Amino acid sequence: MLLSLNWLREFVPYTGTAQELGDRLTMLGLELEEIIRPFDAIADIVVGHVLECGRHPEADKLSVCRVDVGTEVLDIVCGAPNVAAGQKVPVAKVGVTMPSGLKIKKAKLRGQPSCGMICSESELELSDESDGIMVLPQDSVPGVRLVDLLQLDDTVLDISITPNRADCLSVLGLAREVALAFDLPLTMPQLELREQGEDAGSDVTIAIADGAQCPVYQGRIIEGISTCPSPLWMRHRLKSVGVRPISAIVDVTNYILMELGQPLHAFDLDLLEGARIVVETAAEGERFTTLDGQERVLKASDLLIRDGAKAVALAGVMGGANTEINDASRRVFLECAVFKPATIRRTARRLGLSSESSYRFERGVDQVLSTFAMNRAAQLMCELSGGVLRPGVCRAEPAPWQAAQLRFRPARAAALLGISLDDGFCRETLQKLGCTLSGADTPEWTVTAPSHRHDLEREADLIEEVGRVYGMDNIPPVLPKVSKPLEQGRTDSEYEFWARIKAWGRGLGLNEAVNYSFVGHKDLDFLGLPAGNRISIMNPLTSEQDVLRTELAPGLLNTLRHNLAQGSTGLQVFELAHIFEADQSSDTTARESGRLGLLVYGQRYQDGWPRREEDAGYEDLKGIVEHLLRVLNLGPAAFTLRKDHSWLLPCVEIRVGSVCAGVAGRVKPDIADAYHARKDVWMAEIDLDALRTLCRDVAVQFSALPVFPPVKRDITVMAPASVPVSAVTDHVRGMSLKLFSDIVLVDVFEPETPEGGTPERNLTFRLTFRHAERTLKDKEVDKERDKVAESLTEALGVRI
C-alpha cells in the first residue's frame, strides 16, 4: 500500500517525518518497506515566463524564446508548436538532469544559443501527453519550483499490509492507525452534495439473487457530465500512489478507492437497458467481454452484474466493454457494492484478473462506509466533470451489516500479554479503535467491533490490539518460570519427539511423505469418515481442498496414486503431521492431534538379484510398528481385531497396555482400486500424542548381557482359525514361568478343512528359556514347556 504523506495529512495533523511514521507503523504491525519521493527527479524544474517568442531564422519548426526564470532571463530554442509569448512554463536550466537521465547543457541549435529547455508533461514524466509544452496557470510566479507550485513535494511510504488488515488498504485506514499511534484527531472529508432534478431512487431497480454473495448494492445517477481530464492535483496525487490517470470520471473512482478503500464502478447509463440491475451468478460456460477487450469464459460460481438484457460487469473484478464510459457519455450510473470476498477471490485468480478493486473485495470492504464513499465520489464527479447529481439512491440491501460482539476480560489480557494492565488503558484503547463497550465496570466486557475491522473475531484479537497499542517493544523481557524439574533423557518437546520418529523412519529405509493439511470433503466422504467433526475452510483455494484433514489416509493414498502413475512397483512411506477436528469445548473450537501414517504397498524389495519378487503384506506393516515401539522402549503391543473400521478391512487395533495407540490393516479393495492400486494396500495410523505420553513414563533401565546360553523348544498349537496368534503369545507371556524368556511364531500351516468342519491352523512357536546364573538342564526346560502346553490347552481349548 502506497501512502502519500500529503494525502494522509488531510485526515490527521501529523507533523513528524516519514521515517518516524514508518517506524511507528512497523511496531504496530504495518511494516515499512520503503520511503519514496516520487517527484524528486523534477525537483530542480522551475517556473518560467515566456517574455518573447519568435521564429528561428534557420528552421521553421523551431522558436527562439526569451524566458524569465526569476533570477535571470534565458535564451531558449523550443520546438513545441504551442509555445507562445506570455505563457508560464516549466523550465529545466543548464545543469539539470531530466527524469530520463538527459543532462541539460548549453548548446547552439542552427546557430542560435539555447540555455535550457522548456518541458512537456511527458518529458517531466507527469503524464503521457507529448503534443506540446506544459502550460502552467497564469498566476504562477517565475523562479518558483514546479513541485512547490503543483504541490508535488511529497513523500510516499510503501507499507506492507498483512492479509487480515483489509481496513488499512486506504489512506483513511492508515490514518486511523496514525491517529491511534500518535493520539491525533481524525478528520473525515466534508460532504456537500448539491442535488438537482426529480428523485432518481426508482429510476433503476436493483435485484440481488443471493444476499450472501452481495449484501448491498447501490448507485446514484449523475447527468450532464463531460469526459474531460481530471485536474492536475488529482492526476499527480493518483500518480504518486501508482495509479495511472485516465479521465475525470474514472479517476474519481480510483481516487475514492485509494482514499476510502471502497471500489466503485461507473456505467454509461444510456448503455444500460431495461432500467434494471440484477446481481446473480453466471451460467456455466457463459461468455463475457471485459473492459480490456478479452472474452472470458465464466463458471457458475462467478458473480455477474446484468441489466435488463445483458451482462454488464464481472462483479468485483472488472466492468464490461459494452457499458464503459466513453467520450460520448453524458449520464453516469455510479455503482457502489459489497461482494462476498471468497467469490471474488476465486474468480479473480481463475481468470488472472487481479486489480486494485478485486484486491480489496477479496479481503473485505466496509459495508457501513460504502454509502459515504459513494456520495463522496458523486460530489467529486460533479465538481470535476460539470455534472448534476440527481436526488435519491437506487439501493438494495438484503443483508444489513451485523456488528460482531466479543467478550473482553482485562485480567485475561494481562495474563496473555504478561504485563500489568490498567482497565482505563484497555477501555481507552478499544474506544480509539472504534469499538463500543458495555459492562466495562465488570470483569467481563462486551465489545462491539467497528464495521471496518473484519479481523476482530474473538477475544484474543482484542487482546492483540491492546498489546499493539501498548507496544510489543515495551513489554519487559522475562525468563520463563520452570514449573517442573528438568529430567535428563525425557523428550517433553513435541519437536524433539517428532525428530526422533523421523530419524527412525529414515533409518529404517522408509520414504517420508509431506502432504497438504487441506483435503476435500469428497475425499473424507469416500473413506466413510464422519462429517460432524470436520473443520471447513472459509476461503478454500480449490474445491478439492475445502476442509482440514481429520486423518492422514487421504494424503497418503494420493501419494500412492502419484507414485503409481510414475511407474513405481513398491512403496513404503511414512508421514508425521497434524490432524484437525472440531471441538466446541476448546477456546479455538478445534483440536489438533499428532499422527504417524504408514503405507506399505507392492514389491517388498527393489529389483535385482538375489532378492525374490515378493509383495509386502501385513507382517511387514506389523513389524514396522513393533520396531517403532521397541525403539521407544514401550514394549510389546497387542494387535486385536476390529470389525467396524470405515476404510480398513481387516483392521486391528494397536494397544500398548490399556492405551489405544492406533489402527492398522488393509485398505478396502474398492477404495484401493479408486486410487489405481492393483495390489493390497496396507496402512497404519498411530496416535503420536498417546505414544509421547507413554514415553514420559518409561524409565530406561540397564540390563546386563546374558552370560549363559539360551535353550529353545518348539511347540505346535493346533487351534481354530478364529484364535489369533496374539492370544497364544499374550497368554504365555502372562504365565509365571521362572525360566521363560521369549516366544515367537516361526511357522503357520493351514490344512484342508473337511466338509462341514471348523477351519483350523497349526501354529508353531519357538520358546526361549534362560537362567541368568547357570546353564539349564533339559529336564527343567521340558518341564517348563509342558507347563506352557497344559496351560494353553486349559485356557484356550487348543491341542498341542
Curated annotation (Swiss-Prot):
UniProt enzyme class: ligase
Entry-linked Pfam families: B3_4 (PF03483), B5 (PF03484), FDX-ACB (PF03147), tRNA_bind (PF01588), tRNA_synthFbeta (PF17759)
HAMAP family named among the record's database cross-references: Phe_tRNA_synth_beta1
Cofactor note text: Binds 2 magnesium ions per tetramer.
Domain B5: 401-477
Subcellular location field: Cytoplasm
Catalytic reaction equation(s): tRNA(Phe) + L-phenylalanine + ATP = L-phenylalanyl-tRNA(Phe) + AMP + diphosphate + H(+)
NCBIfam families attached to this UniProt entry: pheT_bact, YtpR
EC number(s) from the headed UniProt entry: 6.1.1.20
SMART domains referenced in this protein's UniProt entry, alphabetically: B3_4, B5, FDX-ACB
Main location: cytoplasm
PANTHER family: PHENYLALANINE--TRNA LIGASE BETA SUBUNIT, PHENYLALANYL-TRNA SYNTHETASE BETA CHAIN AND LEUCINE-RICH REPEAT-CONTAINING PROTEIN 47
Subunit structure comment from the entry: Tetramer of two alpha and two beta subunits.
Domain tRNA-binding: 39-147
Residue span(s) of domain FDX-ACB: 706-800
Cofactor(s) required for function per UniProt: Mg(2+)
Full protein name: Phenylalanine--tRNA ligase beta subunit
Family of this protein: Belongs to the phenylalanyl-tRNA synthetase beta subunit family. Type 1 subfamily.
Gene Ontology molecular function: any one: tRNA binding
GO cellular component: phenylalanine-tRNA ligase complex
Record CDD domains: PheRS_beta_core (cd00769), tRNA_bind_bactPheRS (cd02796)
Hydrolase keyword on record: no
Source organism: Oleidesulfovibrio alaskensis (strain ATCC BAA-1058 / DSM 17464 / G20) (Desulfovibrio alaskensis)
UniProt: Mg(2+) binding residues: 455, 461, 464-465
